[in-house]
Design a protein with these regions (language model features):
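Pyridoxal 5′-phosphate
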Residues: 1-156
Length: 156
């Protein structure tokens, strides 16, 4: 061992490695990939997109709610982006978390040119992302929260 040498080793793979290898991280990555392969990527995607469609169908006609994106496009990510009236997306996200315990992402999502194209550069959007681990009940609760919040905010 040459732990205290002032020159980094030149031989491979040591030249590319510093410190102790992240063995726990590698084991977790291996287990995660194994689980994905066992479940089937297509099966997981179908479930996630079904949850996103369920949410979309429940919020798309709610007064004051604007949903962005085409849910018929395939393949697509299980994401629904929306706004409530002219409310700032960060305010909507804060209320969803504080009052309903629903975690979403608000803002420009590192896509400023898309927001310019959508006309949401100032407001941003509220992004709901669904995963295999969400339940239909959670999706319905999120949709009910959006509808209730829209009624509340539009009456202010």
């Amino acid at each position: 061992m040459h732990s205290f040498d002032e020159v980094h080793p030149l031989q491979m793979p040591t030249a590319l490695e510093t410190g102790t290898l992240n063995v726990h991280g590698l084991a977790g990555l291996c287990a995660g990939v194994r689980w994905l392969l066992e479940q089937g990527v297509e099966s997981l995607a179908a479930r996630e997109n079904a949850l996103a469609r369920l949410f979309y169908e429940q919020v798309r006609t709610a007064p004051g709610v604007t949903v962005y994106g085409d849910m018929t496009m395939q393949p697509r990510a299980p994401i629904v982006a929306l706004n409530i009236g002219q409310e700032d997306s960060a305010r909507v996200a804060d209320i969803l978390w504080e009052d309903y315990g629903i975690c979403v992402r608000a803002g420009a999502h590192c896509a400023p040119l898309m927001h310019k194209a959508l006309g949401t550069a100032e407001q941003g959007v509220v992004r709901f992302s669904f995963s295999h681990f969400n339940t239909e009940q959670e999706v319905q609760q999120a949709a009910q929260a959006v509808c209730a919040l829209a009624r509340e905010l539009l009456c202010e």
